[in-house]
Amino acid sequence: TNFAATPVAHPILANLTLIGNGGSKQGVRLRAGTQVELYNTLITGKGQPLTVETTETETALKEGVSKLEYVAISKTLSSKEGIYTNDMFAAATGNLTAQNFTWENLYEGTIDGGKDLSADSFFTKAEYKGAVKTGDNWTSGNWIKQ
């Protein structure tokens, strides 16, 4: 398999709260040449909340083609190749490891301090990590199945 084949998808994702089922396996798994920009995100509920693997994926992170910024995880980053390590992740802008998250109503909660992405008109300014701020539950209402 050629993990350097083109075209390469490169999504930009921001203000996510990802809570796993408490299992011991991986939560977010970046591999197979994946490129991504992930900002203002909370990841918890898995034995390995954030795993990176394959030379191409880890090299893109190390060289800044892919970015993980203002990402808080409940344990440490797992690196299969050792190219992009937990120390590199922890040193990146705004990242936090070994966090104990507190939730209201199952999934409400954020951590102050996030990347302002409002220069891109697609994003709304949200200077916090996570998706749903306590007391500002935008998920309630008629658009979501209750």
Model segments located where?
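Extracellular beta-rich repeat passengers
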Residues: 1-146
